[in-house]
């Protein structure tokens, strides 16, 4: 019998595809513009570097004759101590590990090699460039740790660079690199990858349009700041602005109570102060012009009365002239509005104090009342009633739901209403009258008698 626990082993072999499929490596090009100014907190950015494109700048090569002096914190006695670093020996004197196939990897002169320093590896002290004719300086066998680390990184970069050059034409690449470096001796030598990107952009193979810088965007769309940033930067100014808003809200409330029929916009503490102020000034200007037009209408009516009286005494038949002109007052409306806009003066600029204007208005209304009574006695025309109808004072009061009229609170009529004598109630209480006989009771009594 076969054993119960049979273990079966499977061998899996990887079979190549019948068609040689190319291996595609995704390439993600670097973005030329990241717009970091729109993402980071601007208070942490140097104002001089705001909206400036970042260009990586390499440290200049220090000659071997110069010495690097690094400042050290002061000693106990307060004197500054400077440490002088000796020149670093030439890199060519350091033995370079030979690659696996030295025949296929051509040697490249030191001038043709260009390397990019990584941001995470910054060798310190800096590598000092020496002249070709000068022999390597003798240095102690014990080297700092930073120099040894730098040389290791240098060797790895050189070996990777050899591999890249070995795949193409070594001599052509070397000559192009030498000529390029000799052409720009004072500038920093660029890396092969950077050179390839630059040549690609110059030849126009990269058809993608470069994004605009942040300066061009702000010129086109404007520099709109977020209003929620640094709201309490100036707290006293914000507090004063809130006080002005409360004052304007109170003024708007008074305007609604004084002019209930006028549509006045509503505002809150979250509204803009400048918008509230402009709206209040424009609303007050419109109401002031309307009030001035009404005053001019009263002046016109007073002039019509004077013309009727004067021309009537001369011999002209002027009876009903004031009434007829008052009914056609709408013809004067346009000219009166234009005159009111022309003579508009803000209350803060008005030279006459409010007390004098109040007394003048009272005298003017008294004069109109007296002249209207005089004309009413002579012509039997109630001009005062016409004036009240014209001014809108005799409109029927609005009745609320509970049955009471709105009265003076609604702004439709005066609290003092003139009541004629014929309609006045008697102050003496009426005598009580006896209740008469009921018709139904008499009929019921007669029917009982007949029965």
UniProtKB/Swiss-Prot annotation:
Residues 175-222 have a biased composition (Basic and acidic residues). The keyword Transmembrane helix applies. GO terms for cellular component: membrane. Its main location: membrane. It comes from Invertebrate iridescent virus 3 (IIV-3). Residues 104-121 have a biased composition (Polar residues). Residues 89-150, 164-222, 401-451 are annotated as: Disordered. It is a single-pass membrane protein. Belongs to the IIV-6 067R family. Disulfide bonds: none annotated. This is Uncharacterized protein 004R. Keywords: Membrane, Transmembrane, Transmembrane helix. The chain crosses the membrane at residues 358-376. It is found in: Membrane. Residues 137-147, 403-414 have a biased composition (Low complexity).
């Amino acid at each position: 019998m076969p054993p119960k626990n049979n273990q079966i082993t499977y061998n899996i072999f990887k079979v190549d595809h019948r068609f040689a499929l190319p291996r595609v490596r995704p390439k993600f090009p670097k973005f030329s513009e990241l717009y970091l100014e729109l993402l980071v907190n601007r208070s942490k950015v140097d104002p001089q570097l705001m909206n400036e494109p970042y260009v990586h700048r390499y440290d200049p090569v220090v000659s071997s004759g110069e010495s690097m002096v690094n400042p050290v914190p002061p000693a106990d006695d307060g004197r500054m101590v400077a440490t002088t670093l000796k020149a670093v020996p030439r890199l060519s004197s350091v033995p370079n590990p030979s690659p696996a196939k030295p025949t296929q990897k051509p040697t490249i002169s030191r001038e043709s090699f260009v390397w990019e320093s990584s941001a995470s590896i910054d060798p310190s002290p800096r590598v000092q460039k020496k002249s070709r004719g000068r022999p390597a300086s003798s240095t102690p066998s014990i080297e700092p740790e930073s120099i040894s680390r730098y040389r290791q990184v240098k060797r790895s970069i050189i070996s990777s660079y050899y591999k890249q050059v070995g795949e193409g034409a070594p001599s052509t690449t070397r000559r192009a690199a030498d000529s390029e470096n000799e052409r720009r001796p004072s500038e920093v030598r660029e890396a092969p990858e950077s050179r390839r990107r630059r040549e690609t952009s110059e030849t126009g193979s990269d058809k993608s349009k470069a994004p605009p810088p942040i300066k061009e965007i702000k010129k086109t769309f404007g520099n709109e700041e977020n209003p929620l940033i640094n709201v309490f930067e100036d707290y006293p100014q914000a507090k004063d602005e809130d006080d002005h808003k409360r004052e304007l809200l109170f003024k708007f409330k008074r305007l609604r109570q004084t002019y209930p029929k006028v549509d006045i916009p509503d505002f809150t503490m979250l509204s803009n102060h400048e918008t509230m102020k402009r709206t209040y000034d424009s609303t007050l200007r419109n109401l002031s012009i309307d009030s001035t037009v009404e005053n001019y209408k009263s002046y016109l009516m007073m002039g019509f009365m004077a013309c009727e009286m004067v021309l009537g005494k001369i011999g002209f038949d002027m009876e009903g002239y004031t009434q007829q002109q008052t009914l056609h007052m709408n013809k004067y409306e346009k000219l009166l509005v234009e005159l009111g806009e022309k003579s508009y003066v803000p209350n803060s600029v008005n030279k006459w104090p409010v007390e004098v204007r109040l007394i003048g208005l009272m005298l003017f209304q008294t004069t109109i009342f007296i002249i209207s009574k005089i004309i009413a006695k002579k012509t039997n025309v109630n001009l005062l009633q016409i004036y009240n109808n014209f001014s809108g004072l005799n409109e029927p009061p609005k009745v609320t739901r509970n049955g009471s009229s709105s009265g003076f609170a609604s702004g439709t009529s005066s609290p003092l209403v003139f009541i004629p004598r014929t309609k006045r109630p008697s102050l003496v209480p009426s005598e009580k009258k006896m209740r008469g006989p009921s018709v139904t009771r008499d009929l019921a009594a007669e029917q009982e008698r007949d029965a």
